[in-house]
Amino acid sequence: MLINFLRLLPPETAHQITLKLLKSNFKIYRNKTQQFKTLKQTILGIDFPNPLGLAAGFDKNAEVIKSMLSFGFGFVEVGTITPKPQKGNQKPRIFRLIEDEAVINHLGFNNDGCEKILKNLKSFYKNDNYAGVVGINIGKNKSTQNDIDDYLYCIEKLGSYGNYITINISSPNTPGLRDLQLRGRIETLIKKIQNKQNEIKQIINKPIFIKISPDLNDEQLRDIALMSLANNVKGLIISN
């Protein structure tokens, strides 16, 4: 009934209502989660109960981490988070593809910004019963004067509140973001991020992943692969 009702609404409205219901502890039906030892795996020191996780984009503001973990996800990645709050692109910006059972989004990193989301993360970790892997996905503001500084700011503010950090340079919806994937620029970004990481005791050993776009050409992929190997990048999140 609820799902059918939500499908009658504009997709972004349906998403917002779902988040409000989850925040209010509304008893949305959930399967009783079962753990299977064969699905457990440890990657870069992180113990994942299973490999199926919730990607960034659903819980942009870290409001419903506990609820989503209770559905059985092996991890939840929040964000993308930018230093300052921003509204994102003009609506409508989410479109249903009924026949493909999919959606297209043109959101543009809409989120509440570091300061407010930091409070949400602190609130989540106050619960002694929390369990699960949390990733922090960070990006740059649309109007920033220095994109690299945006990433460094987010890492300093939020890095200690996730099991891993994702550097999002993949979105086509933020002007200039994908330019950070270009040879030279991406290496400068990574080196500055690693320097910042080494300055902060709480995150010095946390994995940092780079999220790249799905439509890079072969030369670009080769450049990123070689740069990643040369700079000991822990991993890539491939496709948006």
Locate the predicted segments by residue.
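An N-cap/entry alpha-helix motif that binds or orients negatively charged groups
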Residues: 1-41, 105, 110, 114
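Short secondary-structure transition/capping segments
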Residues: 10, 87-91, 178-179
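Conserved alpha/beta-domain cores
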Residues: 48, 56-59, 110-126, 130-240
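Active-site cofactor/substrate anionic-group-binding motifs, chiefly glycine-
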Residues: 48, 57, 64-84
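A short, small-residue-rich loop immediately preceding and capping a beta-strand
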Residues: 52
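Short, conserved acidic/polar surface loops in the N-terminal third of protein domains
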Residues: 64-68, 86-93, 146-148
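A gly/proline- and charged-residue-enriched helix-loop-helix capping module
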Residues: 79-130
